[in-house]
């Protein structure tokens, strides 16, 4: 007779613990819980990668909207930043555009100067 020992029980308890809070069979039945947990872990892994892309897209959209008020577009602005030697990343620039418009305006003016010199 085959003995289903502690390791098997431990494995099942671990899966059911991860499935706690799921609805219906997904939180009670080991087989259903295992499927749900595997899918959830896959989504978790995938979305950690996607989150970075989505935030970058959001920052770019905010910067683009902010610089258009000053007669520039995003790509020209980023080019001007490089020429002016300003090393602020997109996250900081987007935050500055939303929370500190005066400082952002100064950055835009520096960029415009750098673009006109060259």
UniProtKB/Swiss-Prot annotation:
InterPro entries: Ribosomal_bL20 (IPR005813), RIBOSOMAL_L20_CS (IPR049946), Ribosomal_protein_bL20_C (IPR035566). Binds directly to 23S ribosomal RNA and is necessary for the in vitro assembly process of the 50S ribosomal subunit. It is not involved in the protein synthesizing functions of that subunit. Keywords: Ribonucleoprotein, Ribosomal protein, RNA-binding, rRNA-binding. GO terms for molecular function: rRNA binding; structural constituent of ribosome. Pfam families: Ribosomal_L20 (PF00453). One of its GO terms (cellular component) is cytosolic large ribosomal subunit. The gene is rplT. Belongs to the bacterial ribosomal protein bL20 family. GO terms for biological process: ribosomal large subunit assembly; translation. The keyword rRNA-binding applies. This is Large ribosomal subunit protein bL20. The lineage of its organism: Bacteria, Pseudomonadati, Aquificota, Aquificia, Aquificales.
């Amino acid at each position: 007779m085959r003995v289903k020992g502690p390791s098997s029980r431990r494995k099942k308890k671990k899966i059911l613990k991860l499935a706690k809070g799921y609805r219906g069979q997904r939180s009670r039945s080991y087989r259903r819980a295992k499927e749900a947990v595997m899918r959830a872990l896959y989504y978790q892994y995938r979305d950690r990668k996607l989150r970075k892309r989505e935030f970058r897209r959001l920052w770019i959209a905010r910067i683009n909207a902010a610089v258009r008020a000053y007669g520039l577009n995003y790509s020209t602005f980023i080019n001007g930043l490089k020429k002016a030697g300003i090393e602020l990343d997109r996250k900081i620039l987007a935050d500055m555009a939303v929370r500190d418009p005066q400082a952002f305006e100064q950055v835009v003016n520096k960029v415009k100067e750098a673009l006109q010199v060259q």
